[in-house]
Design a protein with these regions (language model features):
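N-terminal signal-anchor/start-transfer transmembrane helix
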Residues: 3-25
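Short, highly charged, low-complexity non-transmembrane loops/tails of multi-pass membrane proteins
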Residues: 124-141
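Alpha-helical transmembrane-segment detector that highlights a single hydrophobic TM helix
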Residues: 50-82
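Cytoplasmic-side transmembrane-helix entry/capping segments in multi-pass membrane proteins
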Residues: 25-39, 57-63, 82-94
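Hydrophobic, membrane-inserted alpha-helices
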Residues: 14-16, 40-42, 91-101, 117-118
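Alpha-helical transmembrane segments and their membrane-interface exit regions
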Residues: 14-18, 64-73, 116-128
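Membrane-helix boundary connector in multi-pass membrane proteins
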Residues: 81-86, 90-91, 95-113
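Loop-to-transmembrane alpha-helix initiation sites
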Residues: 54-63, 104-117
């Protein structure tokens, strides 16, 4: 396989790391993205030491970690807001991270994961309703 394949694997594994971190940390999306990027960069460095890809592995995995963290943080936040338990949500998100990591080994899907997960999260964010919009109208005299 060429370097493009290993860069895609690094990006996909970075996304999986970001998803796992978003499910296990109780932090803001920015903090999850930073930690996800750091873990992704470490994964990318490991892949770079093992297979060709040069600095592209490290950059792709770091970007994937940040993208996965931001995307999954939106989903986790919504699940917890709607009454999901922290442990149950973390377990489900860990399973999703495992599935994302498995899909990263399919050629070109790692790239797709790094682009699709933040796009889905942005769509969810736009569709989320205003919280307690009706109560504000009742408070007016």
């Amino acid at each position: 396989m060429g370097a493009w394949y290993w860069i895609g694997v690094a990006a996909g594994l970075g996304v999986a790391a970001g998803v796992l971190i978003a499910g296990s940390l109780r932090a803001a999306a920015v903090a999850v993205a930073v930690v996800g990027a750091a873990v992704g960069a470490a994964l990318g460095y490991g892949i770079d030491a093992w297979q060709p890809g040069s600095w592209g592995d490290v950059v792709a995995a770091a970007a994937g970690g940040a993208a996965g963290g931001i995307g999954a943080a939106q989903v986790v936040r919504g699940a917890l807001r709607r009454g999901g338990t922290r442990g149950g949500t973390a377990l489900i998100v860990a399973g999703a991270a495992l599935a994302v990591a498995a899909l990263a080994w399919v050629p070109a899907l790692g790239y797709l994961e790094a682009v699709a997960l933040p796009a889905i999260a942005a769509r969810l964010r736009r569709r989320s309703p205003e919280t307690y919009a009706g109560l504000r109208t009742l408070a007016k005299d």
